Amino acid sequence: MVKEKDKPKNEIIIETENLNLFYTDFKALNEINIKILKNSITALIGPSGCGKSTFLRTLNRMNDLVEGIKIEGNVIYEGKNIYSNNFDILELRRKIGMVFQTPNPFLMSIYDNISYGPKIHGTKDKKKLDEIVEQSLKKSALWDEVKDKLNTNALSLSGGQQQRLCIARTLAIEPNVILMDEPTSALDPISTGKIEELIINLKESYTIIIVTHNMQQAGRISDRTAFFLNGCIEEESPTDELFFNPKNTKTEEYISGKFG
């Protein structure tokens, strides 16, 4: 059972200002302006190809890895523009972590999957690493299931366990924000329920932005929802308002299933 959502704080942690993104000559994002509240869950919904995953990747500069990308506008994280020339991209990706659609554990043990990030960032003490591994797995609701087999290959876990492992791996490097790109689309309903409950619990300590095609999921877990269409945000508001009293005709048509 997914617990009731708590109200988020009113502190802004991420804000985009007139954000545009081009793939060569194609404009994939058009004048995106949105404020993300600290310790909130924001859902990004919309039809395939609408720009929601592209937008998600602008928030920790994952789109930098794609050839031919051009960005205009600002993404302000904790008061600083992440696209400024002197911004530390590695530190950005530590503070704004990413969980992908398909679970992608490393081909190594459960323990090494979690300790890998902290080691890369300079943690060498075995006792400290043990503590990070345990706490990260507890936060991701996986510890009780794997504590007696930490040296087992991570690929031996079920799909749902692998996704929670990937979340634990993200938590191990102490992010402030967690980006999730359809994290349950490849999972069965029971595993999906566990991930949703985990996401709501994580909101107490982290800010979460999730892309989902599942509007029921957005309604269950998110505080605010942004509806994307053709590279634009058509509407963004508290989730209950957007689903039950949309202000935009296109939003109403989408959530009622008239297109998608």
Swiss-Prot record:
Membrane-protein topology: Peripheral membrane protein
A GO MF label: ATP hydrolysis activity
CDD domains named in the record: ABC_PstB_phosphate_transporter
UniProt-listed GO biological process terms: phosphate ion transmembrane transport
Statement: the UniProt record of this protein carries the keyword Aminoacyl-tRNA synthetase: no
Record-listed E.C. numbers: 7.3.2.1
Catalytic function, reaction form: phosphate(out) + ATP + H2O = ADP + 2 phosphate(in) + H(+)
Alphabetical list of SUPFAM superfamilies matching this protein: P-loop containing nucleoside triphosphate hydrolases
Sequence intervals crossing the membrane: none
InterPro entries (alphabetical): AAA+_ATPase, ABC_transporter-like_ATP-bd, ABC_transporter-like_CS, P-loop_NTPase, PstB-like
Annotated positions binding ATP: G46, P47, S48, G49, C50, G51, K52, S53
Record-annotated ABC transporter domain positions: 14-255
Compartments it resides in: Cell inner membrane
GO cellular component: plasma membrane
UniProt KW Membrane keyword: yes
UniProt keyword annotations, A-Z: ATP-binding, Cell inner membrane, Cell membrane, Membrane, Nucleotide-binding, Phosphate transport, Translocase, Transport
Enzyme class of the recorded protein, top EC level: translocase
Quaternary structure, from the entry: The complex is composed of two ATP-binding proteins (PstB), two transmembrane proteins (PstC and PstA) and a solute-binding protein (PstS).
Similarity comment: family membership: Belongs to the ABC transporter superfamily. Phosphate importer (TC 3.A.1.7) family.
Function comment: Part of the ABC transporter complex PstSACB involved in phosphate import. Responsible for energy coupling to the transport system.
Name of the protein this chain belongs to: Phosphate import ATP-binding protein PstB
Name of the gene encoding the protein in the UniProt record: pstB
